[in-house]
Curated annotation (Swiss-Prot):
Mop domain mapped to chain residues: 289-352
InterPro entries, per database record: AAA+_ATPase (IPR003593), ABC_transporter-like_ATP-bd (IPR003439), ABC_transporter-like_CS (IPR017871), Mo/tungstate-bd_C_term_dom (IPR008995), ModC_ABC_ATP-bd (IPR011868), Molybdenum_import_ModC (IPR050334), Mop_domain (IPR004606), P-loop_NTPase (IPR027417)
One annotated GO molecular function: ATP hydrolysis activity
Subunit and interaction comment: The complex is composed of two ATP-binding proteins (ModC), two transmembrane proteins (ModB) and a solute-binding protein (ModA).
Catalytic reactions on record: molybdate(out) + ATP + H2O = molybdate(in) + ADP + phosphate + H(+)
Entry protein name: Molybdenum import ATP-binding protein ModC
GN (gene name): modC
Domain ABC transporter, residue spans: 1-229
Residues binding ATP: 31-38
Organism: Escherichia coli O6:K15:H31 (strain 536 / UPEC)
Role: Part of the ABC transporter complex ModABC involved in molybdenum import. Responsible for energy coupling to the transport system.
Localization: Cell inner membrane
Keywords, in A-Z order: ATP-binding, Cell inner membrane, Cell membrane, Membrane, Molybdenum, Nucleotide-binding, Translocase, Transport
């Protein structure tokens, strides 16, 4: 568990945090440039020193301004992956990985190398590596120090799109197979969508929102970040069944289900899906003989006018689902809070 209760002033920027983060999964730190994202992880890593408050990791005090405690970075057991890989140019990849490696990780070396897909790189110098390869090595080096927490400061920011696509699957594998909590700084919605379990949104050094990805994604805090065509819902589901006759898989959402193209996933596997608001239409009665496979009973929570369109907030199985309709449709259906209706879902995408 990471307890953050501190304030820090750097020049004209003030960062104030009072949050507790669980000791598992990936927490994305999101916000515009200058919001305080890098300042936050620099304070956690010991690269900067808060003027007030405390930082506690798994019961160990890293910072306590009142008591004058400030552990040096090497004593914090915190790994740090920078935007630029910062590998030692005169060491081969193997030497970079072994530099600072904890004794407890010696037996894990081969497994981690395989997990990151860097076996073919071990005898090469950093200068011969692509940007994505360098970042994989940097992540491996950080993990081999046996950290209790891994900090990643926009590790994909300096990569072109093909290299980002190359690295994302490795990061997804890490989240599943390495039981180390991570703080992932990014201003990329796509990266957050594919990697994060939780999101902390920073603005001018203050926390504007913090919680599970699907909750923060559906909140008003994220609206300015999502263009109209990308307004969507993120929902947690589990694999319910595979159709006996068609290449389709049913996903449980509360006591209802959604059909998607067949997935190579076991029953009860937890997944995350994304549904675009523009792919949700509303009807008052369950449709008959329709090609749309997914029709969910839903309750209207609220509706909001948005530049000639209406965003309708729905509750389905205790989760939030957004629909975008016209003012004409709103008036004709008499949309109001508490109304029960049916949401027709045209398309579902799997995000994680």
């Amino acid at each position: 568990m990471l307890e953050l209760n501190f304030s820090q002033t750097l020049g004209n920027h003030c960062l104030t945090i009072n949050e507790t983060l669980p000791a598992n999964g990936i927490t994305a730190i999101f916000g515009v440039s200058g919001a305080g994202k890098t300042s936050l992880i620099n304070a956690i890593s010991g690269l900067t020193r808060p003027q007030k408050g405390r930082i506690v990791l798994n019961g160990r005090v890293l910072n306590d301004a009142e008591k004058g405690i400030c552990l040096s970075p090497e004593k914090r057991r915190v790994g740090y992956v920078f935007q630029d890989a910062r590998l030692f140019p005169h060491y081969k990849v193997r030497g970079n990985l072994r530099y600072g490696m904890a004794k407890s990780m010696v037996n894990q070396f081969d497994k981690l190398v395989a997990l990151l897909g860097i076996e073919p790189l071990l005898d090469r110098l950093p200068g011969s590596l692509s940007g994505g390869e360098k970042q994989r090595v940097a992540i491996g080096r950080a993990l081999l120090t046996a950290p209790e927490l891994l900090l990643l400061d926009e590790p994909l920011a300096s990569l072109d799109i093909p290299r980002k696509r190359e690295l994302l699957p490795y990061l997804q594998r890490l989240t599943r197979e390495i039981n180390i909590p991570m703080l992932y700084v990014s201003h990329s919605l796509d990266e957050i969508l594919h990697l994060a379990d939780r999101v902390m949104v920073l603005e001018n050094g203050q926390v504007k929102a913090f919680g599970a990805l699907e909750e923060v994604w559906g909140s008003s805090v994220m609206n300015p970040w999502l263009p109209k065509e990308q307004q969507s819902s993120i929902l947690k589901v589990t694999v319910l069944e595979h159709h006996p006759h068609y290449a389709m898989t049913a996903l449980a959402l509360g006591d209802q289900h959604l059909w998607v193209n067949k997935l190579d996933e076991p029953l009860q596997a937890a997944l995350r899906i994304r549904i675009q608001a523009s792919d949700v239409s509303l009807v008052l009665q369950p449709p008959q003989q329709t090609s749309i496979r997914n029709v969910l009973r839903a309750k209207v929570v609220n509706s909001y006018d948005d530049n000639g369109q209406v965003e309708v907030e729905l509750e389905v199985g205790g989760k939030t689902l957004w629909a975008r309709i016209s003012p004409w449709a709103r008036d004709e259906l008499a949309i109001k809070p508490g109304l029960w209706l049916y949401a027709q879902i045209k398309s579902v995408s799997i995000t994680a």
